[in-house]
Amino acid sequence: GRFGGKYVPETLMHALTELENAFHALATDDEFQKELDGILKDYVGRESPLYFAERLTEHYKRADGTGPLIYLKREDLNHRGAHKINNAVAQALLAKRLGKQRIIAETGAGQHGVATATVCARFGLQCIIYMGAQDMERQALNVFRMKLLGAEVRAVHSGTATLKDATSEAIRDWVTNVETTHYILGSVAGPHPYPMMVREFHKVIGKETRRQAMHKWGGKPDVLVACVGGGSNAMGLFHEFVEDQDVRLIGVEAAGHGVDTDKHAATLTKGQVGVLHGSMSYLLQDDDGQVIEPHSISAGLDYPGVGPEHSFLKDIGRAEYDSVTDQEALDAFKRVSRLEGIIPALETSHALAYLEKLCPTLPDGVRVVLNCSGRGDKDVHTASKYLDV
C-alpha cells in the first residue's frame, strides 16, 4: 500500500540499498541461516514454549463453564527476557557480514538496548546506545546492564527525551558514520528495508506457533493477540498467519490515561497518516501535522508512530486494533502474576488486559494465542509505585 518507503537524507540511500541487497543475499545463504539458527537455539534458547495458561483460562470461564482456551507464546523465556533478541542477533550477524564493526541502536524501555549490547558482547562489536534522558531515569537498571555488557550509553536530552528523540539521534549518528556503522533498529518501523527485515527476523515466533499448535491440538490458533508499540512482537506472531483468513489478528495499543485525553500512545486507534523516521505510517499528530508526544506507563509502547505493515493491515481490515489504559495494564500485570506465576512486562500486560474485553465475546473452546513478549522484572519498580499488593 502507501505505507513504508524511504524518506531519508540522500547520504543514507546507499546504506539502505546496501543493507537490502545484503539481506536478500543472506536470506538464501544456507551458511548464514545455519549460523543464525544455531545461535537462536543455543544462545537465545529457542524454541520458546507455547504454554497453556490453565488458571487464566479458568478465570475467564463463564458461569456455565464455557469460555476460550488461552495459550501464551513464551518469548519472555528467551535470553535477556524478551522477543527483542531475535532481531538483534540476526542484525549483528548481518553487520559482521557487511564488515561493520561499530553498532548503534536506539532504545526506549532499554530492552532493545540490552539485547543489542548483549549481541555486541557476543560478537565482539563496538556498541553505542542512544536513550532518552527521561527513559534512562525510568529504566536505570537497564542502563547499568548495557554498560555492564560493554556498551556506551548516550543520553538524549532533546524534545521529551524519550524514544522518538533517541531514534532521531541514532539516525543522525548513522548519517555521519555510515561507512563504518550498522544501525540495529529495534522495531518494524523506520525506512525500508528495516520494517521488512525486522519482521523477517521475528517471524520465527509465528512459525513456531503454527508448528506447536499443530502438535498440541492438530490445528491453528483461532485468535492471535499481541501488544503494539512499534509492532515488532505482534508482526513476528501475525506474519505467518496473515494469509489464514480464519485466524483473527488483534493488536493492543497503549491508551495511557484514555484515548480521549492527550496522554496515550494509541497510534492506530487515533492517529493520522504521516511520515516519521523515514517511513509513512499512522502517527499521533496535531492539526498542524506536528508529532504529538505519546504517553504510556510502558516505556516500550511510548512511541508516536507504528510499523507501516500494521498500518496496512489496519487499512485493509485484516487486523483489528484496540487499546487498554495504564490502569488496565497494571491490573493485568498483577492478575497474571497471581494466576500463573508469570510476571509479564508492562508492554505484554496491555495484551493480557485486553483479554478482559475479548474473552466474554468468544465462543466456547476458541483457542487464543497471546504473545508473552517479555518478562516484567524491569517493570517491578514502576508497578510498585501504583499497585497495592
Swiss-Prot record:
Keywords: Amino-acid biosynthesis, Aromatic amino acid biosynthesis, Chloroplast, Lyase, Plastid, Pyridoxal phosphate, Tryptophan biosynthesis. It comes from the Eukaryota. It catalyses: (1S,2R)-1-C-(indol-3-yl)glycerol 3-phosphate + L-serine = D-glyceraldehyde 3-phosphate + L-tryptophan + H2O. The gene is TSB1. It is found in: Plastid, Chloroplast. The keyword Transmembrane does not apply. Its EC number is 4.2.1.20. The beta subunit is responsible for the synthesis of L-tryptophan from indole and L-serine. Disulfide bonds: none annotated. It comes from Zea mays. PROSITE patterns: TRP_SYNTHASE_BETA. Pfam families: PALP. Tetramer of two alpha and two beta chains. Belongs to the TrpB family. This is Tryptophan synthase beta chain 1. One of its GO terms (biological process) is L-tryptophan biosynthetic process. Transmembrane segments: none annotated. Its cofactor is pyridoxal 5'-phosphate. Pathway: Amino-acid biosynthesis; L-tryptophan biosynthesis; L-tryptophan from chorismate: step 5/5. GO terms for cellular component: chloroplast; cytoplasm. GO terms for molecular function: tryptophan synthase activity. It is an enzyme of class 4 (lyase). InterPro entries: Trp_synth_b_CS (IPR006653), Trp_synth_beta (IPR006654), Trp_synth_beta/beta-like (IPR023026), TrpB-like_PALP (IPR001926), TrpB-like_PALP_sf (IPR036052). The modification N6-(pyridoxal phosphate)lysine is found at residue 84.
